[in-house]
Amino acid sequence: MSKSFVNKVLVGGALAAGAAVWAIAPRTFSDKRRNYVPAVPDVWYAHRGLHDAGSGLTAQYASESGEYVALARRMAMKAGYGSPSVVGAIAPENSLAAFAAACEAGYGIELDLQMTADGEIVVVHDGDLMRVAGDPRRVADLTYDELTRIPLFPTDAPGAAVAAPLSGSLEKPPLVTTPDSAPDGYFQHVPLFADVLKVVAGRVPLIVEYKFDDNSKWGPRDVELMEKGDALLQAYSGAYVIESFNPAAVNWYKENRPEVCRGQLSWWPQGEEKPSDPAALAKDYAAGALIFDWISRPDFVAYDWHGGNSPQVRLARFMGAVPVSWTVRSRDELAQCDDWFDHHIFEAFVPDER
């Protein structure tokens, strides 16, 4: 092996390493100082609010989730939602009751923004309502008025992770229609983001996630979501930070609202969640390696808690990015990842006070 070949390999390796460092680098300290960017508030963040039905409440976490569900119901009732006579869910995920419960308990809140067919900004995680309401229709195809007549977890007991399918929801095509009027009795529905902000009213900090159908694309409807969501936040006086899996969304804040603390969401593809399409998988691996951070130059990296000890997260942290975990669902998971993250998004267990 010639000396010149070895030199070329060393130079090539150094260039590749330098390119990786450049790509992963977060926003610079001087840019933060120039724009008076606030830090991520140091609190526990309740994933989709403090909820008694929805995300994370699976059999795997049943040993600790009972205490969590009971707390969610107590805090929701303390805030004026539901009553002991309500046998079903009082505070389902991403509902006004769940957010009010989190405020009563003193937890920060992580929530998700999408846009309805009539251009309203609402808080809901999935692209459709199947998991949370048993209705397979897409949020983007429904008006907000329709959403107010579709109860979240309408027939499910507290602690349910998935809503029971509505009649006709499993047909091909689905035979579900929106009722003419809202059901009788207590229920929660997908809320307007504006109403969520009124309920929270600055009592606890927010992590606001912008959701998209495809995180590798960017179109007029995506821009509309950004502009409308940001307009609501600009009028809000409470503490918040923003995040997204889509680097273009985080870049939107870099270009338009540099004073806002911004975060890049990511994870390392694994198991059944890996896409089967090779091109999509390659994009996911690149995103998981934080290679697209050069687009967004985030202040924090919100990463799947399993990946806190990964080289890319450790490098981003070394260069100044604040690591935030998602979603921690037990004390055991917290113990496994606590050393690698500064802040945690949690559900399904009650964490100790910070």
What would you call each of these model-derived segments?
Residues 2-354:
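Phosphate-group recognition and catalysis centered on beta-loop-alpha active-site segments
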